[in-house]
C-alpha cells in the first residue's frame, strides 16, 4: 500500500472533495511542499486515502495576517479559522499556506 503524503482531519474530507476547501495552513514541519507537487491525501484519524491533490501555490502567513479570503478558501469564517489554527498549533505564530486543487 502506498503511503499518504499529507493528512487532514476527517471533518474536512467532504469540503475538500466538494472543492469548498482549497487551502491548508500548516506549521514549519510541513513547509516543504511546493507548487507542482502531487500529493496522496489521507485522513489524520486512520490514514485512509481519500483523494489526490496538486499544490498550486504556497505562501507564508501569521495568525494576525489571516484574511477573509483565507477563511473562504478554508470554508470557514475568519474567527473560526483563527480558532482552529490556534487549537491545532498552540503557541505557533508562523504558518505556511498550501493552495491546492483536487485531481
Curated annotation (Swiss-Prot):
Belongs to the N(4)-acetylcytidine amidohydrolase family. Catalyzes the hydrolysis of N(4)-acetylcytidine (ac4C). The lineage of its organism: Bacteria, Pseudomonadati, Pseudomonadota, Gammaproteobacteria, Enterobacterales. It comes from the Bacteria. HAMAP family: ac4C_amidohydr (MF_00684). It is an enzyme of class 3 (hydrolase). GO terms for molecular function: hydrolase activity, acting on carbon-nitrogen (but not peptide) bonds, in linear amidines; N4-acetylcytidine amidohydrolase activity. SMART domains: ASCH. One of its GO terms (cellular component) is cytosol. Pfam families: ASCH. The active site is at residues 21, 24, 74. Keywords: Hydrolase. It catalyses: N(4)-acetylcytidine + H2O = cytidine + acetate + H(+); N(4)-acetyl-2'-deoxycytidine + H2O = 2'-deoxycytidine + acetate + H(+); N(4)-acetylcytosine + H2O = cytosine + acetate + H(+). It comes from Klebsiella pneumoniae subsp. pneumoniae (strain ATCC 700721 / MGH 78578). The keyword RNA-binding does not apply. InterPro entries: AC4CH, ASCH_domain, PUA-like_sf. Its EC number is 3.5.1.135. The keyword Hydrolase applies. This is N(4)-acetylcytidine amidohydrolase. Residues 6-100 form the ASCH domain.
Amino acid at each position: 500500500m502506498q503511503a499518504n503524503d499529507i493528512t487532514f482531519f476527517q471533518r474536512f474530507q467532504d469540503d475538500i472533495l466538494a472543492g469548498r476547501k482549497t487551502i491548508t495552513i500548516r506549521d514549519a514541519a510541513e513547509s516543504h511542499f511546493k507548487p507542482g507537487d502531487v500529493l496522496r491525501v489521507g485522513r489524520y484519524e486512520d490514514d485512509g486515502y481519500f483523494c489526490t491533490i496538486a499544490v498550486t501555490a504556497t505562501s507564508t502567513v501569521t495568525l494576525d495576517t489571516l484574511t477573509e479570503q483565507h477563511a473562504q478558501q478554508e470554508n470557514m469564517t475568519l474567527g473560526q479559522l483563527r480558532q482552529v489554527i490556534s487549537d491545532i498549533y498552540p503557541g505557533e505564530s508562523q504558518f505556511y499556506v498550501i493552495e491546492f486543487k483536487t485531481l
